[in-house]
């Protein structure tokens, strides 16, 4: 389960404006529909000039461009702040009548991306339609410190007929779904290739590929091929497309470089790095609280003092971080430490969401599919590390400037299937990206916490200093023994003594000079899944659920010693049941 976060209504086009409070973080679409809806002030729509048209020669294989409209954000009333302004393009293939439209093959449909589109063979004789949508994301703030995120968009349409590929012209193909950067530490890659562009009278083309100087192989039916494991050094892939009209060949070359070694945490301004220990001074798991779905100020845990607060890096101010670390009560420390929560995904309500040139840090080509259930978020192409380094440096640097002790990186499992992410990424792509991110955290004087992603945890342990888990108890994925035999993406989990121990006891037993009793692991279970009862609940209220005492015995008690807590999925400070009961 993914970390709960901000969910708001998407305001489309015209006068209807609805906002859901930010505290609905993590809710499903159904839950969002049933959430209390607050009346929102009217926000002016995006401003545009000109008429949308499709420029270029619309035929099979041709690159066309949506153009003719200039957009800009409107002047906003006082009390409103523009968070991001985006222009998105969706391409559709329609019947000659202009009806019965479906998303065109190869349409990326990413925010402020896909302004250009290459018509395909399947579009011949049909109409190509583009929808250009400008959307603004605006924040309002009230006197009680609550805030709402509002969205409003305006769309324009244009369409053209698509002509056939020229007769007797050699067929062509193109790389799609992106390619790795020219230098990467990933030793394996997937390459997507477009269906051939050709004239039917010249015959159905064949496609073949090869890696380096290897044998030519038939292209798989899904037009995606895998390089296999590659050695450090230069590499090249080639694709050949041929029919009676002739043949063409495309190539892509890049260099695999060694993965950077883990960097030790560098003291900042004379202050030593803080490493979260497996067990605190009282020989028990170090207690923590997690508040990132905030619409109100941070809540102290009062008598249930904790040693660590995991809080939103953007929403929390430097003054709040200082107050927590110098004045708030703690459990075993003088004062609590603070963890800076950062999402590695694109979130449209963050101040860096706009593309470069508009005050943001996410190039259009790096954005993929929408997160399921989280329409305000997009997957990010981890292959494009150099393009995303400015974003990582700024976000992690923000945590350091605010005085955080550690950083939690969320959404690191970017090698999910392409149907989920929009990219064909490998575990090696994730390792290349995350090695840079965690080393950057250490270079800025903070420690780093791994998040979920058990298939890579055995590797991530070398670069990180602890872990945050979600519902490992619910899904029976806490220990190396529970995960043993799990296999995906070429990774097979072994037991704790094997080469790839995917369990989190691999962290707690990892004893280093900085963490002599192992690395801290915190687990969050959520009440909305009805898997663990609340403390003191019995009978009908707990029918079919595990008791709170059993949950604590399994995770908090030896030998695991996880800092186990039951939260509400909103993570807004209202629900906090740490193990053991009464703590």
Where are these regions (language model features)?
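Compositionally biased low-complexity segments, especially N-terminal hydrophobic helices
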Residues: 8, 17-18, 24-30, 184, ...
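Short helix-terminating capping/connector loops at secondary-structure junctions
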Residues: 80-85, 202-203, 331-335
């Amino acid at each position: 389960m993914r970390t709960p976060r901000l969910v708001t209504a998407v305001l489309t086009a015209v006068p209807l404006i609805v906002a859901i409070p930010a505290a609905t973080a993590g809710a499903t679409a159904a839950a969002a529909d049933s959430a209390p809806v607050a009346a929102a002030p009217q926000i002016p729509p995006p401003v545009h000039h000109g008429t949308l048209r499709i420029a270029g020669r619309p035929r099979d294989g041709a690159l066309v461009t949506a153009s003719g409209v200039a957009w800009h954000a409107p002047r906003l009333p006082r009390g409103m702040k523009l968070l991001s302004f985006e222009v998105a393009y969706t391409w559709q293939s329609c019947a000659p009548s202009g009806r019965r439209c479906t998303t065109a093959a190869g349409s990326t449909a990413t925010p402020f991306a896909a302004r250009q589109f290459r018509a395909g063979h399947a579009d011949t004789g049909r109409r190509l339609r583009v929808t250009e949508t400008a959307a603004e994301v605006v924040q309002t703030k009230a006197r009680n410190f609550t805030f709402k995120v509002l969205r409003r968009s305006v769309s324009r349409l244009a369409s053209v007929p698509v002509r056939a590929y020229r007769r007797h012209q050699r067929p062509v193909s193109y790389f799609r779904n992106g390619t790795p950067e020219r230098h990467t530490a990933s030793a394996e890659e997937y390459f997507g290739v477009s269906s051939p562009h050709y004239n039917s009278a010249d015959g159905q083309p064949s496609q073949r590929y090869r890696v380096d100087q290897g044998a030519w192989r038939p292209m798989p039916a899904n037009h995606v091929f895998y390089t296999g494991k590659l050695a450090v050094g230069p590499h090249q892939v080639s694709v050949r497309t041929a029919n009676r009209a002739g043949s063409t060949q495309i190539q892509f070359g890049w260099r695999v470089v060694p993965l950077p070694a883990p960097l030790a945490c560098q003291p900042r301004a004379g202050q030593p790095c803080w490493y979260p220990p497996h067990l605190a001074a009282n020989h028990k798991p170090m207690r923590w609280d997690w508040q990132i779905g905030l619409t109100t100020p941070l809540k102290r845990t009062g008598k249930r003092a904790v040693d660590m607060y995991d809080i939103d890096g953007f929403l929390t101010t430097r003054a709040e971080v200082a107050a927590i670390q110098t004045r708030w009560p703690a459990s075993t420390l003088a004062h609590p430490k603070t963890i800076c929560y950062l999402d590695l995904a694109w979130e449209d309500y963050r101040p860096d969401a706009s593309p470069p040139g508009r005050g943001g840090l996410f190039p259009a080509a790096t954005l993929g599919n929408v997160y399921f259930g989280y329409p305000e978020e997009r997957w990010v192409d981890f292959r494009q590390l150099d393009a995303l380094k400015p974003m990582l440096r700024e976000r992690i640097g923000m945590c350091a400037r605010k005085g955080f002790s550690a950083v939690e990186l969320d959404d690191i499992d970017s090698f999910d299937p392409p149907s989920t992410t929009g990219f064909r990424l490998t575990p090696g792509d994730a390792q290349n990206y995350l090695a840079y991110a965690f080393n950057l955290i250490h270079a800025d004087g903070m420690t780093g916490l791994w998040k979920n992603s058990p298939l890579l945890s055995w590797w991530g342990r070398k670069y990180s200093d602890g872990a945050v888990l979600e519902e490992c108890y619910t899904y029976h994925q806490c220990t190396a023994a529970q995960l043993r035999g799990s296999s995906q993406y070429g990774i097979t989990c072994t037991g704790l003594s094997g080469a790839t121990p995917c369990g989190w006891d691999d962290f707690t037993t990892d004893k280093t000079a900085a963490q002599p009793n192992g690395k801290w692991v915190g687990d969050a279970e959520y009440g909305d899944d009805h898997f663990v009862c609340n403390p003191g609940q019995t009978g009908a209220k707990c029918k079919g659920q595990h008791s709170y005492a059993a949950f604590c015995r399994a995770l908090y008690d030896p030998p695991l010693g996880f800092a186990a807590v039951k939260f509400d999925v909103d993570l807004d400070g209202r629900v906090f049941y740490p193990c053991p009961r009464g703590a």
